[in-house]
Structure formats: C-alpha cells, structure tokens
Design a protein with these regions (language model features):
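Non-catalytic, conserved peripheral segments adjacent to functional cores
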Residues: 1-106
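Short tryptophan-centered beta-strand motifs in secreted/extracellular beta-sheet-rich domains
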Residues: 110-112
Length: 112
C-alpha cells in the first residue's frame, strides 16, 4: 500500500497493492493496522455505496462538529475526478483544492 499526502492536511491518496491474473484481481482496500501505521484513522463505523450514471456531478459534502466523519472513497467501475476543497475556517489551506483520478483501473482510494 502506498499513501501519498496531498497539499491539504487530512487528505490522502491511497494506492493498494493489486494482484491481477487471468481470473481478475484481488486488492486489500482496508486493513486497520496498516491504515493506523500510515496515520489514517482506523475506526470506520459506517460503509456507504452510491452509483452515479455517466455525466453525473455530485455536490460538495461537509459535516459540522459533532457530526464530522472521515470518508474513504473508491471507484469499482469507471472513473471519477475526485475534488476536495478545504472550507475549514482557520486552515492554512482554506479555499484551496486538491484532486485525484480514482478509477477501477488504478484502484486508488481517497481518504478525506
């Protein structure tokens, strides 16, 4: 697993090891011990999945304390250009954004 820090604190791009063969592939997308060692909170309590048709634009998501939650975003079919905007007042990167291509092909995940 490779973890790349972005210019926005708390946002990482994760590339898991993917083992491909004639049958398909296998990838470990989450391992609490490995995530914790990489500085990623390892106490996920909810797992969601959504399907977006081609051309769909999903809006910005934001949670205020005490309802904040981390997100681990991955794509299982197709691709998305995942954009994260820092709207945290007082953050040194307030107003800046970072983006990553997440796809079934590259198997990258975004931890927000």
């Amino acid at each position: 697993m490779e973890v790349v820090e972005t210019e926005i604190a708390g946002v990482k791009v994760i590339t898991p090891r993917v083992f491909r063969d004639a049958r398909g592939y296998f990838a470990e997308t989450y391992n609490a011990a490995r995530y914790k060692a990489a500085g990623i909170p390892a106490d996920f309590v909810q797992d969601n999945e959504s399907l977006s048709q081609k051309g769909v634009l999903r809006g910005l998501h934001w949670q205020a304390a005490p309802h904040t939650q981390a997100k681990l975003v991955r794509v299982v079919r197709g691709a998305v250009w995942d954009v994260v905007v820092d709207i945290r007042a007082g953050s040194p990167t307030f107003g800046k954004f970072t983006a990553a291509m997440l796809s079934a092909e590259n198997a990258n995940l975004a931890e927000i």
